[in-house]
Each structure stands twice: as structure tokens, then as C-alpha cells.
Amino acid sequence: MRTLQGWLLPVFMLPMAVYAQEATVKEVHDAPAVRGSIIANMLQEHDNPFTLYPYDTNYLIYTQTSDLNKEAIASYDWAENARKDEVKFQLSLAFPLWRGILGPNSVLGASYTQKSWWQLSNSEESSPFRETNYEPQLFLGFATDYRFAGWTLRDVEMGYNHDSNGRSDPTSRSWNRLYTRLMAENGNWLVEVKPWYVVGNTDDNPDITKYMGYYQLKIGYHLGDAVLSAKGQYNWNTGYGGAELGLSYPITKHVRLYTQVYSGYGESLIDYNFNQTRVGVGVMLNDLF
């Protein structure tokens, strides 16, 4: 653990170091949004003060899983009748609280991401929601153009993340994290790394880092109009983790056809220690680019 803390300290200090490189930072707040940059997008001024911005991807897909974690939801009176096919959707939005808090390329922001697994076809049990994860964040972000070895560092973000399924015992799952998010691009490639440090009480899931690790890695590739994506988390000490692959293609100006495959542990909080493979297809409103 001391080794991990020693590694994380410089990571969490990196945002301030990058911000200090004033010579490499351009004023992007009044320029066209940088492709794939969450922070540059949030720095765009709009006439409507209530404008919300996409944070993570927003999608709705119909899915089928290889196995269902009925043991974790045994306290639900419909658990034995739970189905393997579900509608999975994610809503993820951000709002700039204070643009320019530490210079023209900085923003104090908040985001909210909700991911749900809905037993839509289970009409005999009134189509219940098997699991919903609620993930609010408060963060400080910087839009940069720091270049290294052909890559351009676009987003530097550090903040506080709360992730919970909003349930009471015995199905309550939650954890709190301090995190840093770094996003860089190189041509059609996008790479994002998000290390975190768990804080507070994890009594509901004391071994969650065993399966979820201490970071998330995300990779995107723009292939013509299509976007290929991969993201995952892994604990090198335990050998547990999970990965998600995605492919999207535009079908209208604002809607994309989306296919997703998730395999491993941690697809949801209730399944953080459960191994499965889920395949889904549906629509998406925004991808990584």
C-alpha cells in the first residue's frame, strides 16, 4: 500500500505541474472545441446559462449476459425470476460551476453519471431495475496543449468521485475516490488514464479494489466515421479486472449505432466481484470523439 501511495502522490501533483507550464497552454476557451476534450467543451460559452455538457458517453442498448448474479440480489423477492436479457443505459452530464477559476483554461465543474440495468422484458415481475449506479463528481479541470513524443495532453482533471447503488443492506454498494484524469490524443488516437485513491468507508464492499484496481484506462480510435473504443480496470496484484469494447457509427446527425461487449468483473457495483460477459446493441448520442 505504501508503494501505491508513493506512486499516486506524483500523479495527483501532475495537474498543478502541467498548469504551471504556461508557455505550452493556449487560450482555448473561445476556440472551437478540441475533439475528445471534455474540459475544452465545458469551456465553450453558450447564451443559455443552463446548458449541460456530455461527460461520459450517453447510450441505450439491449443486452444479453452469459450469467446473472442472482446470489447478490437474493433478498429481492423476484431474484429467482430475474432474466439474463436487460436494457442497459447510461446518462452522463457535466456542468461548469466556475470557468476561469485558475486561469482562462481552467474550470471548476460537476458531473453526474447514472448507469442502469433494466429487466424490461421481465413483465411478470413488473419490469424492475435490477441495478442502478449513481456517480456524482466534483472536479477541477484544465485544457492544455502540452506536447510530448507526438502526443498532445488535452485534459488534466482532478476531483472527488462518489459511486453508489443507492440501496440499503444487504445489497448496498458504494465507494468514494480521489482521482486524476489525464487525456491525450495523437491523430486518430485518444488515450485516457484515470488513477484513483479510495477514501472513506467501504464496509459494504471492503474488497472492491481487489476486483476494480486503482485505475481505469480508456483508448479510442477514429476510423472514418466509426469510433472504436476500449476501456478497463485491472489489479495487477490479484489478476482481477474487467474490460469493455465498443463500436459506434453515425446513423443520423445526432444518433449513432452502438455495439458494446463487457467481459470480466465490475460491470456494476452489485457485480463488482462477479465475472460475466455481456453483449449489447443499441443507440448512442455521443462517443469519445
Curated annotation (Swiss-Prot):
GO cellular component term of the entry, any: cell outer membrane
Activity regulation behaviour: By membrane damage, for example, by phage-induced lysis or temperature shock. The protein is inactive in the monomeric form and active in the dimeric form; calcium is essential for dimer stability.
Entry membrane topology: Multi-pass membrane protein
Extracellular topological segments: 66-84, 119-128, 165-173, 199-216, 235-241, 266-274
Key word Hydrolase present: yes
Domain of life of the source: Bacteria
Entry cofactors: Ca(2+)
A GO term, aspect molecular function: phospholipase activity
Binding site for Ca(2+) 2: R167, S172
Keyword field contains Calcium: yes
Subunit composition and interactions: Homodimer; dimerization is reversible, and the dimeric form is the active one.
NCBIfam families, per the entry: PRK10763.1
The protein's name in its UniProt record: Phospholipase A1
Organism: Escherichia coli (strain K12)
Record gene name: pldA
